[in-house]
């Protein structure tokens, strides 16, 4: 029962917060501050009561499950602070439903991370998916938001059906839905269980869809463009980190010498994700669509670590995802500070010459872009170096060379952002009142990207 305490606590926090937000409608900001404080305290609860030496999880990744959940919750709290300050910045009403949806989404991620059963894993991912559809369509009067959310919902429903179909295959050919039992079946020397492998592949479609990897990526640019930037920040950080942890958690089931079909399939997915993400972003003018393709590219990098099938590879994948999530939070936060209400229309034109008026913000965006390129001594360089080094060390030369090549290609559009800020024709930007929560997040992002490599080395 204590192992479920983090999930129960977050659910109660979300529901109680929503109750008081409805009963006292004019105090949403005060309620949101209290909820954020309670969530910060919940990090310690999550770490304490999720921290058991689960043989399955520790054997797969060597990372404590309590740490994993705490990381996801921390990034969710940051997303909540960004939404709170964004609503103040644009003088908009803070809708507490947004925070409730984020918290319930995290509960789904927690359930998925803790599960050792395919059906429970599916339920956790579906709770996350349903709340994500609502977050994507939160701009009720915006046609693009509604269109993106509808695409997201329809494709997500289709993938969920495939995932359930896969679970039926797994149960039919494996006789169980427990991870340990299925792993035992896959290790059985009686021959390749093709039906079981097909079931696992079908189930994986749901995870790859939520990770935005090729070929289940077509929804990403439209959803990112139409969704509120606060939703995109959550999708790109807490949600993606959670799904990466889930994928690592079941890595022993999907990759092994006894069924190379899965390995080769994921290898193709990783290479195509890197190529499509790198080249697809080149002609984009919307910064949100640019980050959508950047996400596809970086998920391809993360899959390199998964394919290495050892603890060093898993750690490299999770570390890289954390570094990318921090960078994307910094980028979106800077756009909010610069553009306010117009942030969802952010493009290269809207940031032209901003270095003249906002030197600090331009410097932060530049550091984020250089880190995403992988320029030393920024943390992004060490994340990529560690990942590619492990790939070369395991003689995965195709993955490493593809990663290096696409990093060079991606440098073009990352540097294009820097060029627009410093070398393009200047446009005057209205200075908005500073929100100290957003400013603090930016300072923390810069500190991590500049000094994170020293922290990581220890």
From Swiss-Prot:
Assigned EC number: 7.1.1.-
Residues that span the membrane, as ranges: 2-22, 30-50, 62-82, 94-114, 118-138, 153-173, 194-214, 235-255, 261-281, 290-310, 318-338, 361-381, 397-417, 438-458
BP GO terms, sorted: ATP synthesis coupled electron transport
Entry annotated with the keyword NAD: yes
Protein's membrane topology: Multi-pass membrane protein
Keywords (A to Z) from UniProt: Cell inner membrane, Cell membrane, Membrane, NAD, Quinone, Translocase, Transmembrane, Transmembrane helix, Transport, Ubiquinone
Top-rank EC class of the record's enzyme: translocase
Cellular component terms (Gene Ontology): plasma membrane
GO molecular function (one): NADH:ubiquinone reductase (non-electrogenic) activity
Catalytic activity: a quinone + NADH + 5 H(+)(in) = a quinol + NAD(+) + 4 H(+)(out)
Localization in the cell: Cell inner membrane
Domain of life: Bacteria
This protein's record includes keyword Lipid metabolism: no
Signal peptide residues on this chain, from the entry's feature table: none
Principal location listed in the UniProt entry: membrane
Similarity annotation: Belongs to the complex I subunit 2 family.
Biological function: NDH-1 shuttles electrons from NADH, via FMN and iron-sulfur (Fe-S) centers, to quinones in the respiratory chain. The immediate electron acceptor for the enzyme in this species is believed to be ubiquinone. Couples the redox reaction to proton translocation (for every two electrons transferred, four hydrogen ions are translocated across the cytoplasmic membrane), and thus conserves the redox energy in a proton gradient.
The protein's assembly and partners: NDH-1 is composed of 14 different subunits. Subunits NuoA, H, J, K, L, M, N constitute the membrane sector of the complex.
Name of this protein: NADH-quinone oxidoreductase subunit N
């Amino acid at each position: 029962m204590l192992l479920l305490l983090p999930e129960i606590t977050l659910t109660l926090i979300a529901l109680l917060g929503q109750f008081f937000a409805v009963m006292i409608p004019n105090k949403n900001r005060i309620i949101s501050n209290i909820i954020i404080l309670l969530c910060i305290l919940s990090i310690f609860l999550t770490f304490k009561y999720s921290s058991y030496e689960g043989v399955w999880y520790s054997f797969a990744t060597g990372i404590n499950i309590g740490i994993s959940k705490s990381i996801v919750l921390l990034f969710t709290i940051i997303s909540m602070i960004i939404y709170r300050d964004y609503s103040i910045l644009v003088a908009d009403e803070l809708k507490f439903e947004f925070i409730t949806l984020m918290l319930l989404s995290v509960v789904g991620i927690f359930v998925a991370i803790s599960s050792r059963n395919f059906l429970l894993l599916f339920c956790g991912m579906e709770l996350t998916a349903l709340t994500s559809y609502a977050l994507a369509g939160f701009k009720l009067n915006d046609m693009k938001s509604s269109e993106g959310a509808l695409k997201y919902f329809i494709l997500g429903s289709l993938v969920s059906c495939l995932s359930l179909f896969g679970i039926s295959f797994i149960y039919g050919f494996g006789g169980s839905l427990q991870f340990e039992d299925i792993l035992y079946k896959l290790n059985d020397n009686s021959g390749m269980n093709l039906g079981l492998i097909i079931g696992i592949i079908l189930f994986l479609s749901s995870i790859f869809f939520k990770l935005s990897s090729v070929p289940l990526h077509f929804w990403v640019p439209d959803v990112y463009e139409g969704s509120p930037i606060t939703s995109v920040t959550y999708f790109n950080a807490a949600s993606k980190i959670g799904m990466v942890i889930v994928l690592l958690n079941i890595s022993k089931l999907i990759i092994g010498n006894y069924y190379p079909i899965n390995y080769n399939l994921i290898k193709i997915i990783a290479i195509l994700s890197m190529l499509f993400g790198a080249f697809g972003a080149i002609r984009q003018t919307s910064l949100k669509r640019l980050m959508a393709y950047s996400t596809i590219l970086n998920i391809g990098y993360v899959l390199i670590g998964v394919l290495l099938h050892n603890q060093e590879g898993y750690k490299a994948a999770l570390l890289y995802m954390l570094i990318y999530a921090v960078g994307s939070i910094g980028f979106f936060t800077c756009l909010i500070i610069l553009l306010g209400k117009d942030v969802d229309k952010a493009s290269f034109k809207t940031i032209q010459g901003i270095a003249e008026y906002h030197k600090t913000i331009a410097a932060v965006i530049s550091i984020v872009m250089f880190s995403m390129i992988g320029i030393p001594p920024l943390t992004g360089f060490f994340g990529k170096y560690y990942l590619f080094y492990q790939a070369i060390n395991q003689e995965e030369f195709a993955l490493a060379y593809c990663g290096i090549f696409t990093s060079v290609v991606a440098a073009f559009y990352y540097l294009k952002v820097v060029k627009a800020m410093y070398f393009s024709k200047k446009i005057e930007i209205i200075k908005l009142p500073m929100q100290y929560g957003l400013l603090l997040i930016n300072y923390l992002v810069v500190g991590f990207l500049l000094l994170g490599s020293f922290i990581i080395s220890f």
